[in-house]
């Protein structure tokens, strides 16, 4: 670590840690950020902007949950282009415009249980499907736009998205077609780095079981997870996917992120392209090469949060919510829409037992305790496995005999200990493992038999609600 910057990184780490609770108040809560491709009658990316008025006037006919049925939605507008609607916020759930005009994000939670999450999520999804149906459109349980390629024309007209396209080029435009299934799980301050490391280490487990994007731009790719595979060797691939090694602590986390280029800088409400290493931004813009005990200049921490927001590793800590965000899953098939959320929560709840198993199974003999960061000896094998499962899914050789079954069993036991019966939601994953076929492998077979229209037909959410 750069000696002149160490105190700066340490100070930023202290401020970052303060956004997480000293201890959790009861069982972990879970939230969900689920992205869905929406396609028009021809199967091409629709324009989400046409859905807002239909969602606003749509009547909620879903059953009330404990959190209440649909409350009125409030329009959220872009800070720069105030004519642009970027989302609709309600008490139980919200909708948000995504990078691509044809992708919409559903946000639900935090919820006390997966069943509470499922109830609110289903209400939001039913309302979305009804609105899309009025235009003859389809909402897909799939991880990418199946027919429309990533283009600048598909980019949502948020000012910051244009700035990111200017600096990242094709790597940013890729996000105009992708659709992930993410979860937010609350974590305490003391465990934050350990959970972050573990969440990244589990990326290949999630991809193996939940990849669902082999068909992109109407063509069959070589990957079960096309949305992950595209970024492995991309120019900005270091910002995406599984990290190269575990972080020793939060100071190390800040230091590692600071060695990446800052993509944006703030000028009033606008975000403009940047490009310098964030460590240089700290030094040149904030005089951040401080001596011990010197206070950071105003705006330094906000600049770090802006930088951190545009790094998309498989797991990342979110100061706004005090959570770990888990990101590797593609959007799931419409008949198994809770599978990834259940897996995410089970992994976090079972972290200690799963980590102990992984270390025993994968760490080279005699190396388990040599590194200051737990599980670092397992990292190279899991990184290799990550690349294999992106390509081959559950056909990839496991890093140890029965590896996935053991991890899934430990996640299941962890959910069972919560006492809500949530472990039932892992049933689709057990079926996938038994068949050795994840959704991406299944979609590959559908495409080979029925083409891209067959893929859209089996991914159509309306058929399963």
Predicted regions and their residues:
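Terminal catalytic/cofactor-binding subdomain
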Residues: 1-172, 177, 211, 322, ...
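Loop-rich catalytic cores of soluble enzymes, especially ATP-dependent carboxylate-amine ligases
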Residues: 140-319
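Conserved, mostly hydrophobic/aromatic
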Residues: 36, 183, 326
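Long, repeat-rich segments with strong aromatic
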Residues: 287-300, 314-356
């Amino acid at each position: 670590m750069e000696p002149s910057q160490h105190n700066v990184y340490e100070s930023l780490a202290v401020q970052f840690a303060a956004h997480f609770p000293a201890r959790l108040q009861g069982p972990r809560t879970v939230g969900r950020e689920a992205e869905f491709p929406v396609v028009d009658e021809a199967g091409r990316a629709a324009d989400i902007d046409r859905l807002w008025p239909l969602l606003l006037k749509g009547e909620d006919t879903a059953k009330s949950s404990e959190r209440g049925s649909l409350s009125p939605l409030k329009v959220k507008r872009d800070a720069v282009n105030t004519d642009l609607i970027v989302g609709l916020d309600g008490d139980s759930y919200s909708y948000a415009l995504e990078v691509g005009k044809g992708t919409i994000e559903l946000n639900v939670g935090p919820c006390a249980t997966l069943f509470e999450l499922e109830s609110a999520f289903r209400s939001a999804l039913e309302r979305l499907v009804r609105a899309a149906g009025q235009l003859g459109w389809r909402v897909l349980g799939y991880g990418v736009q199946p027919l429309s390629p990533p283009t600048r024309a598909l980019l949502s007209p948020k000012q910051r998205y244009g700035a990111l396209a200017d600096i990242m080029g094709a790597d940013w435009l890729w996000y105009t077609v992708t659709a992930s299934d993410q979860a937010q799980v609350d974590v305490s301050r003391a465990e934050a780095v350990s959970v972050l490391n573990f969440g990244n280490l589990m990326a290949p487990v999630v991809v193996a079981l939940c990849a669902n994007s082999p068909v992109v731009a109407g063509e069959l790719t070589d990957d079960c997870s096309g949305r992950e595979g595209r970024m492995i060797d991309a120019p900005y691939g270091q910002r995406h996917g599984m990290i190269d090694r575990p972080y020793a602590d939060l100071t190390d986390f800040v230091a590692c992120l600071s060695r990446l280029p800052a993509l944006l800088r703030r000028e009033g409400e606008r975000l403009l392209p940047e490009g310098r290493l964030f460590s240089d931004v700290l030094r040149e813009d904030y005089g951040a090469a401080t001596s011990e005990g010197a206070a950071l200049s105003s705006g330094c921490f906000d600049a770090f949060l802006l930088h951190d927001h545009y790094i998309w590793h498989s797991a990342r800590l979110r100061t706004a919510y005090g959570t770990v965000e888990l990101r590797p899953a593609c959007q799931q098939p419409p008949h198994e829409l809770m599978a990834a959320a259940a897996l995410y929560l089970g992994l976090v709840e079972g972290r200690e037992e799963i980590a102990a198993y992984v270390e025993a199974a994968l760490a080279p003999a005699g190396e388990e305790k040599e590194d200051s960061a737990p599980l670092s000896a397992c990292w190279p094998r899991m990184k290799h496995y990550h690349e294999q499962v992106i390509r081959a899914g559950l056909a990839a050789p496991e890093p140890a005999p029965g590896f996935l079954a053991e991890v899934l069993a430990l996640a299941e036991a962890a959910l069972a200990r919560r006492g809500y019966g949530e472990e039932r939601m892992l049933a689709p994953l057990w079926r996938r493992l038994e068949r050795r076929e994840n959704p991406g492998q299944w979609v590959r077979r559908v495409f080979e038999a029925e083409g891209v229209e067959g893929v859209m037909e089996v991914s159509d959410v309306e058929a399963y609600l």
